[in-house]
């Protein structure tokens, strides 16, 4: 039962850990529509930041729900067993309350952003619950649902900023996140095979699926690069020899990063989460820096052409 005295003994950081605030970086996807359209001035829009807060809150609620339902499997995992609910630092009842409060708080923020964003947020929560409850145990389907959840963030950002997103970029996003999700699965399978484990706990994959998952990583990743190139060719941001060259170079950088990530995952050298890998791996940071500089250059070129 809930007890205030008992709850007071739980360190505040334990609650924070359960919310996984480091994953809020993924909600930076809400700002992507503004950036790809070269409208940096719209980054200061209040609705956009309110949408960011919305997804931080609901995403944390879903992570809590995920950890609650995955406690049994996490306790058998070498690293996940240290999570707050798996290690029994937080009780199941505490997790239920945290989940409800976080999702409700996100819903309140979404309502203040308008009906369309509320509908997108509600769809995100519903799809997330379906994923946690059923789909994460289904092989391949889980990759596409995860991709849809990430792409929903981009749609939410476009809605909050009132910016249309080209279909070619949405196709790039969908395939890129299928690739990233499969890279994570590939890395997990490699590590389990190395440890002699029989299967991937709580997921629908077997060790014998290792090669086919690697194939999905590569094919989806390169398909994403093709859609990115299509977006570049159709985009008004890349006009003139220099911007077009920079845009194509950015496509090459993305292709290189995906290829390298697949090799790292195939070796089992990647961290369990691709986000941690992207922000800690030296080559990945160089790629991110290069892409950021290229994006700044394209926005500058667009501002000069408008001026």
Curated annotation (Swiss-Prot):
<feature type="transmembrane region" description="Helical">
    <location>
        <begin position="140"/>
        <end position="160"/>
    </location>
</feature>
<protein>
    <recommendedName>
        <fullName>Nodulation protein NoeC</fullName>
    </recommendedName>
</protein>
<keyword id="KW-1003">Cell membrane</keyword>
<keyword id="KW-0472">Membrane</keyword>
<dbReference type="InterPro" id="IPR000537">
    <property type="entry name" value="UbiA_prenyltransferase"/>
</dbReference>
<feature type="transmembrane region" description="Helical">
    <location>
        <begin position="238"/>
        <end position="258"/>
    </location>
</feature>
<feature type="transmembrane region" description="Helical">
    <location>
        <begin position="117"/>
        <end position="137"/>
    </location>
</feature>
<keyword id="KW-0536">Nodulation</keyword>
<dbReference type="Pfam" id="PF01040">
    <property type="entry name" value="UbiA"/>
</dbReference>
<feature type="transmembrane region" description="Helical">
    <location>
        <begin position="279"/>
        <end position="299"/>
    </location>
</feature>
<keyword id="KW-1133">Transmembrane helix</keyword>
<feature type="transmembrane region" description="Helical">
    <location>
        <begin position="91"/>
        <end position="111"/>
    </location>
</feature>
<feature type="transmembrane region" description="Helical">
    <location>
        <begin position="212"/>
        <end position="232"/>
    </location>
</feature>
<dbReference type="InterPro" id="IPR044878">
    <property type="entry name" value="UbiA_sf"/>
</dbReference>
<dbReference type="GO" id="GO:0016765">
    <property type="term" value="F:transferase activity, transferring alkyl or aryl (other than methyl) groups"/>
</dbReference>
<feature type="transmembrane region" description="Helical">
    <location>
        <begin position="46"/>
        <end position="66"/>
    </location>
</feature>
<feature type="transmembrane region" description="Helical">
    <location>
        <begin position="163"/>
        <end position="183"/>
    </location>
</feature>
<keyword id="KW-0812">Transmembrane</keyword>
<dbReference type="GO" id="GO:0005886">
    <property type="term" value="C:plasma membrane"/>
</dbReference>
